[in-house]
Amino acid sequence: MKIKQRPEDFVVREGYRFEPDLEGPVWVYRMDKQKVSTLQALERISKAFAVRRRDLSICGLKDKQGRTEQLVGVLGGALGDSEVLQSGDLRLKLIGRAAQPLSSRNITANRFEVTVRDLSPEEAERVPESAAEVERTGVVNYFDSQRFGFLKHGQGFIARHLLRGDWESALKAFLATPSELDRSDDAKVKTFWRDHWGEWQLRAPQAAGKRYAPILRRLREDPRDFKGAFLHIDRRLRMMALFELQSFVWNEGVKRYLGARIPAADLIGLRYQAGALVLPRSLPRELRDELWNRTFPLVAPDSRIEDQRVRDAALGALRAQGLTLEQLRVPDSPLFFKHEERPLFVRPGKLRVHPPRPDELNRGKRKVNLSFTLPPGAYATLVVRRVLWFATESARPVLRPSAPAAPAKISRPAAPRRPANEPDARATVAPQEGFLARQRARKEARAARREAARKPPGHR
């Protein structure tokens, strides 16, 4: 199974609501972007149209991969004389004005159109039945791999350094830890600062280094003020550093909770960036209705959890990371964890499976188009992988519980210590290779298939 082979294979359209105000100070544009993240798009708009970054507002962050339509608010004036503006592969169309900057309150839903490729004919035929299963059961509302960008790029959980008050390590993880997966100028900038840490009088030769100018300006003023430099990072990125750890603990707590309530035989497992997830294939109606109406906490120091089973699962996941609620504080800083309740399950709306067709990118394979809506904050990639779990190499049925695992290290997640009746998510998958090893194996397999396809019939 492959998704996002082309940008048009993964299309997201933001559903929105705002009060039009003909005299409002915020000009609202609909932005069409592809192969660029929302934060990167805002940075480009700021440069191209000479707008202060803090005067740009959005409803929510969207993934870099794929094609996205979403709103952008501009405080203080229009970007140009024309209603339609183009900046590279960004297209902006003025749709109105508003009294307030955009925020998450303005988003109503996200509509997805996803093309799943590289399916065998048998796998393609199974998709409608599996989609019907998802409609009956729903999907656990986990945070998927996109939530863990710092982890993906080898920077670990930056929040762990922050909780210890180790601002230098946190800044080094952000500014000077290049990803092995990234060949961009940004990675070269991070390599430069890894090799020249502390030599703040230097200048990275790549243009991408300009985005870190406020951080470096502070370090040139005071070379040991790592805290002040870290607080010059874009606010959204600082928040994401905290959210990654909080989201991981949420995922681990939900796994514990579901493992205590659902028989292992009814669960499947899927790997993701931070480990493995468990999802039910079927649920008794009474339990399903209960779980559909339940939330699960994103924990913070002020969390008060009434339900005993939820509390045991959430706090058990936190303890497995060597933390308590009281320790979820960043000392002497404006950064903080906030308690929130997140729906435990999500139900894709208007889920439609289109008939299989030949896949023009993968010889002899089929492609299937899926379309559905999700509420803000839910992950379409998880819905797609749940529907196509049988075609996902990282998926296996959950077979048995396992012995407790060791607590996590500082820079990467580890499997939590589990109660005896909880299934081991690692038992759901074959022995796990590293991400880079899996990428190399896929490339080698594709190369072998191409080589085999070039050989004449009957050749051995």
What are these regions (language model features)?
Residues 1-17, 21-22, 26, 34, ...:
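Extended, charged/glycine-rich binding lobes that contact polyanionic ligands
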Residues 42:
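Generic structural marker for isolated residues within well-ordered, non-membrane alpha-helices
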Residues 4, 222, 387, 397-460:
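Basic Arg/Gly/Lys-rich low-complexity intrinsically disordered segments
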